[in-house]
Amino acid sequence: MVDKSQETTHFGFQTVAKEQKADMVAHVFHSVASKYDVMNDLMSFGIHRLWKRFTIDCSGVRRGQTVLDLAGGTGDLTAKFSRLVGETGKVVLADINESMLKMGREKLRNIGVIGNVEYVQANAEALPFPDNTFDCITISFGLRNVTDKDKALRSMYRVLKPGGRLLVLEFSKPIIEPLSKAYDAYSFHVLPRIGSLVANDADSYRYLAESIRMHPDQDTLKTMMQDAGFESVDYYNLTAGVVALHRGYKF
Protein backbone atom coordinates (compact mmCIF):
# COMPACT_ATOMS: atom_id res chain seq x y z
CA MET A 1 0.00 0.00 0.00
CA VAL A 2 1.29 3.47 -0.91
CA ASP A 3 1.74 5.86 2.00
CA LYS A 4 -0.20 8.95 0.87
CA SER A 5 2.01 11.15 3.04
CA GLN A 6 4.92 10.18 0.77
CA GLU A 7 3.16 11.03 -2.52
CA THR A 8 4.58 14.11 -4.22
CA THR A 9 3.58 16.61 -6.87
CA HIS A 10 4.93 19.89 -8.20
CA PHE A 11 4.34 23.40 -6.92
CA GLY A 12 5.88 25.42 -9.70
CA PHE A 13 9.35 23.93 -10.06
CA GLN A 14 9.39 22.61 -6.49
CA THR A 15 8.58 19.03 -5.55
CA VAL A 16 6.22 18.99 -2.56
CA ALA A 17 4.01 16.52 -0.73
CA LYS A 18 0.63 16.19 -2.46
CA GLU A 19 -1.17 17.02 0.76
CA GLN A 20 0.74 20.33 1.00
CA LYS A 21 0.08 21.71 -2.49
CA ALA A 22 -3.50 22.84 -1.94
CA ASP A 23 -2.47 24.93 1.07
CA MET A 24 0.47 26.43 -0.83
CA VAL A 25 -1.73 27.37 -3.79
CA ALA A 26 -4.31 28.79 -1.38
CA HIS A 27 -1.63 31.04 0.13
CA VAL A 28 -0.78 32.36 -3.34
CA PHE A 29 -4.37 33.31 -4.13
CA HIS A 30 -5.14 34.71 -0.68
CA SER A 31 -2.14 36.96 -1.31
CA VAL A 32 -3.08 38.16 -4.80
CA ALA A 33 -6.90 38.28 -4.56
CA SER A 34 -7.22 42.03 -4.03
CA LYS A 35 -5.02 42.82 -7.06
CA TYR A 36 -6.09 39.89 -9.24
CA ASP A 37 -8.07 41.82 -11.89
CA VAL A 38 -5.52 44.63 -12.17
CA MET A 39 -2.68 42.15 -12.54
CA ASN A 40 -4.55 40.17 -15.21
CA ASP A 41 -4.89 43.30 -17.31
CA LEU A 42 -1.26 44.28 -16.81
CA MET A 43 0.20 40.82 -17.38
CA SER A 44 -1.76 40.07 -20.55
CA PHE A 45 -2.02 43.65 -21.84
CA GLY A 46 -5.77 43.16 -21.58
CA ILE A 47 -5.81 40.24 -24.02
CA HIS A 48 -7.26 37.91 -21.37
CA ARG A 49 -10.59 39.59 -22.05
CA LEU A 50 -10.48 38.42 -25.68
CA TRP A 51 -9.52 34.87 -24.63
CA LYS A 52 -12.50 34.78 -22.27
CA ARG A 53 -14.81 36.25 -24.90
CA PHE A 54 -13.79 33.47 -27.28
CA THR A 55 -14.50 30.91 -24.55
CA ILE A 56 -18.00 32.32 -24.12
CA ASP A 57 -18.55 32.22 -27.88
CA CYS A 58 -17.49 28.55 -28.01
CA SER A 59 -19.60 27.52 -25.02
CA GLY A 60 -22.94 27.28 -26.79
CA VAL A 61 -24.66 28.39 -23.57
CA ARG A 62 -28.30 29.31 -24.03
CA ARG A 63 -31.17 30.74 -22.03
CA GLY A 64 -32.40 28.47 -19.25
CA GLN A 65 -29.23 26.40 -18.97
CA THR A 66 -27.14 25.66 -15.88
CA VAL A 67 -23.44 26.57 -15.96
CA LEU A 68 -20.55 25.86 -13.58
CA ASP A 69 -17.78 28.48 -13.67
CA LEU A 70 -15.13 26.45 -11.86
CA ALA A 71 -12.11 28.21 -10.36
CA GLY A 72 -14.19 31.22 -11.34
CA GLY A 73 -12.22 33.67 -9.23
CA THR A 74 -13.45 37.22 -9.62
CA GLY A 75 -16.31 36.22 -11.90
CA ASP A 76 -15.43 37.48 -15.39
CA LEU A 77 -17.06 34.49 -17.09
CA THR A 78 -19.90 34.28 -14.57
CA ALA A 79 -20.98 37.85 -15.37
CA LYS A 80 -21.31 37.01 -19.06
CA PHE A 81 -22.94 33.62 -18.51
CA SER A 82 -25.48 35.22 -16.16
CA ARG A 83 -26.78 37.34 -19.01
CA LEU A 84 -26.84 34.40 -21.43
CA VAL A 85 -28.81 31.99 -19.23
CA GLY A 86 -31.28 34.64 -18.11
CA GLU A 87 -33.76 34.43 -15.26
CA THR A 88 -34.68 30.83 -16.03
CA GLY A 89 -31.07 29.63 -15.93
CA LYS A 90 -28.40 29.47 -13.26
CA VAL A 91 -24.66 30.02 -12.96
CA VAL A 92 -22.64 28.53 -10.12
CA LEU A 93 -19.40 30.40 -9.41
CA ALA A 94 -17.17 27.90 -7.62
CA ASP A 95 -13.66 28.40 -6.30
CA ILE A 96 -11.59 26.54 -3.74
CA ASN A 97 -10.19 29.82 -2.42
CA GLU A 98 -12.35 31.80 0.01
CA SER A 99 -10.62 35.11 -0.72
CA MET A 100 -11.15 34.80 -4.47
CA LEU A 101 -14.78 33.77 -3.98
CA LYS A 102 -15.37 36.80 -1.74
CA MET A 103 -13.84 39.13 -4.33
CA GLY A 104 -15.99 37.59 -7.06
CA ARG A 105 -19.19 37.92 -5.03
CA GLU A 106 -18.51 41.58 -4.18
CA LYS A 107 -17.55 42.46 -7.75
CA LEU A 108 -20.62 40.85 -9.32
CA ARG A 109 -23.04 42.32 -6.81
CA ASN A 110 -21.53 45.76 -7.39
CA ILE A 111 -22.29 45.51 -11.12
CA GLY A 112 -25.80 44.20 -10.51
CA VAL A 113 -25.26 40.51 -11.25
CA ILE A 114 -27.64 38.89 -8.77
CA GLY A 115 -30.57 36.50 -8.76
CA ASN A 116 -29.33 33.71 -11.01
CA VAL A 117 -25.82 33.25 -9.56
CA GLU A 118 -24.83 30.98 -6.68
CA TYR A 119 -21.45 30.92 -4.92
CA VAL A 120 -19.87 27.67 -3.75
CA GLN A 121 -16.47 27.02 -2.20
CA ALA A 122 -15.47 23.76 -3.85
CA ASN A 123 -12.49 21.56 -4.65
CA ALA A 124 -12.37 20.63 -8.35
CA GLU A 125 -11.23 17.12 -7.43
CA ALA A 126 -14.42 16.40 -5.44
CA LEU A 127 -17.21 18.62 -6.74
CA PRO A 128 -20.15 18.78 -4.29
CA PHE A 129 -22.86 18.46 -6.92
CA PRO A 130 -25.10 15.58 -8.03
CA ASP A 131 -24.37 13.64 -11.20
CA ASN A 132 -25.61 15.18 -14.46
CA THR A 133 -26.19 18.69 -13.07
CA PHE A 134 -24.63 21.13 -15.56
CA ASP A 135 -25.08 21.89 -19.25
CA CYS A 136 -21.66 23.52 -19.42
CA ILE A 137 -18.56 23.72 -17.24
CA THR A 138 -15.74 26.19 -17.72
CA ILE A 139 -12.44 26.31 -15.88
CA SER A 140 -10.41 29.37 -16.79
CA PHE A 141 -6.75 29.60 -15.74
CA GLY A 142 -7.43 27.21 -12.87
CA LEU A 143 -6.61 23.66 -13.93
CA ARG A 144 -2.85 24.11 -13.68
CA ASN A 145 -3.23 24.83 -9.95
CA VAL A 146 -5.12 21.59 -9.26
CA THR A 147 -3.10 18.87 -7.55
CA ASP A 148 -4.69 15.85 -9.24
CA LYS A 149 -5.83 17.04 -12.66
CA ASP A 150 -7.05 13.62 -13.78
CA LYS A 151 -9.27 13.32 -10.71
CA ALA A 152 -10.62 16.83 -11.31
CA LEU A 153 -11.45 16.07 -14.94
CA ARG A 154 -13.32 12.92 -13.90
CA SER A 155 -15.22 14.96 -11.30
CA MET A 156 -16.21 17.50 -13.95
CA TYR A 157 -17.32 14.72 -16.27
CA ARG A 158 -19.52 13.24 -13.55
CA VAL A 159 -21.46 16.45 -12.89
CA LEU A 160 -22.01 17.29 -16.57
CA LYS A 161 -25.33 16.34 -18.14
CA PRO A 162 -25.24 14.04 -21.18
CA GLY A 163 -24.74 16.37 -24.12
CA GLY A 164 -22.91 18.82 -21.88
CA ARG A 165 -19.49 20.28 -22.60
CA LEU A 166 -16.36 21.24 -20.72
CA LEU A 167 -14.19 24.17 -21.76
CA VAL A 168 -10.70 24.50 -20.32
CA LEU A 169 -9.01 27.86 -20.92
CA GLU A 170 -5.41 27.68 -19.79
CA PHE A 171 -1.87 28.82 -20.48
CA SER A 172 -0.17 26.38 -22.81
CA LYS A 173 2.89 25.94 -25.04
CA PRO A 174 3.67 28.58 -27.70
CA ILE A 175 3.85 27.02 -31.15
CA ILE A 176 6.36 29.53 -32.55
CA GLU A 177 9.91 29.06 -31.23
CA PRO A 178 11.01 32.74 -31.22
CA LEU A 179 7.82 33.62 -29.32
CA SER A 180 8.51 30.81 -26.86
CA LYS A 181 11.90 32.30 -25.97
CA ALA A 182 10.50 35.81 -25.61
CA TYR A 183 7.63 34.45 -23.53
CA ASP A 184 10.07 32.72 -21.18
CA ALA A 185 12.04 35.92 -20.73
CA TYR A 186 8.86 37.88 -20.03
CA SER A 187 7.47 35.27 -17.64
CA PHE A 188 10.54 34.75 -15.50
CA HIS A 189 11.97 38.27 -15.45
CA VAL A 190 9.16 40.76 -16.07
CA LEU A 191 6.16 39.12 -14.36
CA PRO A 192 7.76 38.84 -10.91
CA ARG A 193 8.80 42.51 -11.12
CA ILE A 194 5.27 43.58 -12.02
CA GLY A 195 4.00 41.43 -9.15
CA SER A 196 6.43 43.06 -6.77
CA LEU A 197 5.54 46.61 -7.84
CA VAL A 198 1.76 46.26 -8.08
CA ALA A 199 0.87 43.49 -5.64
CA ASN A 200 3.96 43.59 -3.42
CA ASP A 201 4.34 39.88 -4.12
CA ALA A 202 7.04 38.71 -6.52
CA ASP A 203 6.97 35.11 -5.28
CA SER A 204 3.35 34.47 -6.23
CA TYR A 205 3.97 35.64 -9.79
CA ARG A 206 7.16 33.60 -9.98
CA TYR A 207 4.98 30.61 -9.07
CA LEU A 208 2.58 31.64 -11.86
CA ALA A 209 5.38 31.45 -14.43
CA GLU A 210 6.64 28.13 -13.09
CA SER A 211 3.16 26.59 -12.91
CA ILE A 212 2.57 27.48 -16.56
CA ARG A 213 5.74 25.63 -17.60
CA MET A 214 4.74 22.56 -15.60
CA HIS A 215 1.22 22.40 -17.06
CA PRO A 216 0.55 19.73 -19.72
CA ASP A 217 0.90 20.88 -23.33
CA GLN A 218 -2.01 20.99 -25.75
CA ASP A 219 -1.96 17.37 -26.93
CA THR A 220 -1.27 15.95 -23.48
CA LEU A 221 -4.26 17.78 -22.00
CA LYS A 222 -6.42 16.60 -24.90
CA THR A 223 -5.48 13.00 -24.08
CA MET A 224 -6.16 13.56 -20.37
CA MET A 225 -9.66 14.81 -21.19
CA GLN A 226 -10.30 11.79 -23.41
CA ASP A 227 -9.07 9.45 -20.66
CA ALA A 228 -11.56 11.10 -18.27
CA GLY A 229 -14.40 10.17 -20.64
CA PHE A 230 -14.79 13.28 -22.78
CA GLU A 231 -15.47 12.82 -26.49
CA SER A 232 -14.98 14.96 -29.60
CA VAL A 233 -12.16 16.76 -27.77
CA ASP A 234 -10.48 19.55 -29.70
CA TYR A 235 -8.50 22.67 -28.91
CA TYR A 236 -7.80 26.12 -30.27
CA ASN A 237 -4.44 27.82 -29.94
CA LEU A 238 -4.88 31.47 -28.96
CA THR A 239 -2.11 34.05 -29.31
CA ALA A 240 0.08 31.43 -31.03
CA GLY A 241 -0.40 28.88 -28.26
CA VAL A 242 0.41 31.10 -25.29
CA VAL A 243 -3.10 30.08 -24.27
CA ALA A 244 -5.22 27.16 -25.49
CA LEU A 245 -8.95 26.52 -25.23
CA HIS A 246 -9.84 22.82 -24.98
CA ARG A 247 -13.41 21.65 -25.46
CA GLY A 248 -14.86 18.21 -24.85
CA TYR A 249 -18.34 16.68 -24.64
CA LYS A 250 -20.14 14.12 -22.50
CA PHE A 251 -22.38 11.92 -24.64
Curated annotation (Swiss-Prot):
* Catalytic activity, as annotated: a 2-demethylmenaquinol + S-adenosyl-L-methionine = a menaquinol + S-adenosyl-L-homocysteine + H(+); a 2-methoxy-6-(all-trans-polyprenyl)benzene-1,4-diol + S-adenosyl-L-methionine = a 5-methoxy-2-methyl-3-(all-trans-polyprenyl)benzene-1,4-diol + S-adenosyl-L-homocysteine + H(+)
Question: Gene3D superfamilies given for it?
Answer: Vaccinia Virus protein VP39 (3.40.50.150)
| Keyword terms, alphabetized | Menaquinone biosynthesis, Methyltransferase, S-adenosyl-L-methionine, Transferase, Ubiquinone biosynthesis
Q: CDD domains, per this entry?
A: AdoMet_MTases
Pathway participation: Quinol/quinone metabolism; menaquinone biosynthesis; menaquinol from 1,4-dihydroxy-2-naphthoate: step 2/2; Cofactor biosynthesis; ubiquinone biosynthesis
Q: Does the keyword Transferase apply?
A: yes
A matching Pfam family: Ubie_methyltran
Do you know which InterPro entries this protein is assigned to? SAM-dependent_MTases_sf (IPR029063), UbiE/COQ5_MeTrFase (IPR004033), UbiE/COQ5_MeTrFase_CS (IPR023576)
Q: What molecular function does GO assign, one term?
A: demethylmenaquinone methyltransferase activity
The record's section on SUPFAM superfamilies has: S-adenosyl-L-methionine-dependent methyltransferases
Q: Which GO terms describe its biological process?
A: aerobic respiration; menaquinone biosynthetic process; methylation
User: Could you say which enzyme class this protein belongs to?
Assistant: transferase
The UniProt record gives the binding positions of S-adenosyl-L-methionine as 74, 95, 123-124, 140
Entry EC number(s):
2.1.1.163, 2.1.1.201
Task: Report the function annotation for this chain.
Answer: Methyltransferase required for the conversion of demethylmenaquinol (DMKH2) to menaquinol (MKH2) and the conversion of 2-polyprenyl-6-methoxy-1,4-benzoquinol (DDMQH2) to 2-polyprenyl-3-methyl-6-methoxy-1,4-benzoquinol (DMQH2).
What family is this protein classified in?
A: Belongs to the class I-like SAM-binding methyltransferase superfamily. MenG/UbiE family.
Protein known as: Ubiquinone/menaquinone biosynthesis C-methyltransferase UbiE
Species this chain originates from: Escherichia coli O1:K1 / APEC
User: Gene behind this chain?
Assistant: ubiE
